[in-house]
Amino acid sequence: MADRLAALLAHFSVSARTFHAGALCGINALDATEPFGQLHLVRDGRVEVRHGVRKALEIDEPSLLLYPRPMAHRFITDKRHGATFVCAHVQFEGGPANPIGAALPPFVCLPLARLPACQPILELLFLEAESENCGRQAMLDRLFELVLIQILRVLMEQGQVEAGMLAGLADERLRRALVAVHEAPERDWSLEALAEQAGMSRTSFATAFRDRVGLTPGSYLQRWRIGLAQKHLRQGRSLKLIATEVGYGSEAALSRAFRAQTGSSPREWRNSDAVDA
């Protein structure tokens, strides 16, 4: 079976930065002003989670709570005993253009008991969180990044994402076409060629792709290519080289597709991205 995450993670990395380990008591809030999300591991204790004034969920067993994008949230715990957390900021390279981050729901809550393959990582992470070992920060950050990959696996394997790219990657046939696009965006992918990758007829493939992924195959291909182009633009690469690598025959063809996708030319986008950085 093709590796569904290899090309995604090779092109668009995910990173974590641990910022809390220990008890949280009473009311604790995180705003959405910073350009990253959070991954919280609740080791013990009861936690009420609120999004604004609305009670979103109640956690009463060891669980993880992932916010892949900035989203304000509050935790309400017992004032005296609280709950034990280990928390990290998470960042998906490219921000909103990152296809992994964009494919995830606004938040994910999973009991740790549903992550059996992750137990050795979690045990080491909790042990490290309690220690004062040298390299503790770097160790925790890397362990959180491994947990993120495990979350992606679970969401696909357990079919917990109903639409979008991850839903397509969970489909035994569609995943072959998606992986082919991710691994070789420079190829001249026709609808027939992608349907052949999936082992489906042209019509069946187009319908199934649109229903599961939420885009036509052609729209998805363009979005993937332009996402890669944006990454290369941030790295200062020339439009001519980028056009060849992401599947456009010329700078002009890339510029037309780029403007259709983003509303601006590659140079305009690069200048505005540099100002925002």
Identify the meaning behind each predicted range:
Residues A16-P106:
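N-terminal regulatory/effector-sensing and dimerization cores
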